[in-house]
Amino acid sequence: MTTQTDGRRLRGDRTRRTVLDGAVQEASVRGLDALSFGALAASAPVNKSAVAGLFGSKENLQLATVERASEIYTEHVIVPARSAERGLARLWALVVAWTEYSRSRVFRGGCFFRTVEVEFDMREGCAVRDAVVAAQESWESYLVHQGQLAVDAGELAADTDPAQVAFEINALLNAANDRSLLLGDDGVYERALTAARSLLVARGADRAMLG
């Protein structure tokens, strides 16, 4: 009996992952509000009622989609950068990994979080908005932390504001993502890297450490 139960749970987990992998791609293009049990069932090996049974409500589906997108984001941006030394080297590795994540269309619609943060930015008190905010705050705080480590190590000037550096880097990355999608111009990623490199060098970074 236990073996049968474990087998059903394993199949359910696999099905849930398959549905969510489709959901993050769809939401990156059309937004989280566009998700529906029926549409996701059409592209997964289950019917609409089975998808509904996995999540219970549309909000739960949206929350699970944000969580899955965060996992994929971590896999493609955070994990590759961990091989670099903490501080300036890792900060730069994060910038490079992010540009590759967007450029390679890990999500069909470019950066998943760019799509959904615009969709939910004015919906205060919404659980899905809270999840999107938490994901973005986690990313930004990680950038700030690496910037602070760089300052502490003397890799950036002592008067550098890590939060300002993180803000400017984020702005460059987001602009590259948006313009690449709108204009079909992948050259914007190199321009973003050039601009990010310049802002770090202006704050005392060693150009040789920045690729």
Please identify what each model-predicted range represents.
Residues M1-R14, R207-G211:
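N-terminal intrinsically disordered/low-complexity leader segments
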Residues T18, G22, E26-N60, A64:
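Helix-turn-helix
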Residues A64, I78-G109, P162-I169:
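Hydrophobic alpha-helical connector segments
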Residues E67-T74:
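Short, basic, alpha-helical segments at the C-terminal edge of helix-turn-helix-like DNA-binding modules
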Residues R90, R105-A127:
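Amphipathic alpha-helical segments used for helix-helix packing
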Residues Y101-S104, L149, I169-D186, L199-M209:
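Amphipathic C-terminal alpha-helical segment
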Residues R108, G125-D152, Q164-F167, R191-T194:
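Amphipathic alpha-helical packing segments from all-alpha helical-bundle domains
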Residues G109, R114, A158-R179, R191-S198:
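Hydrophobic alpha-helical segments that form the core
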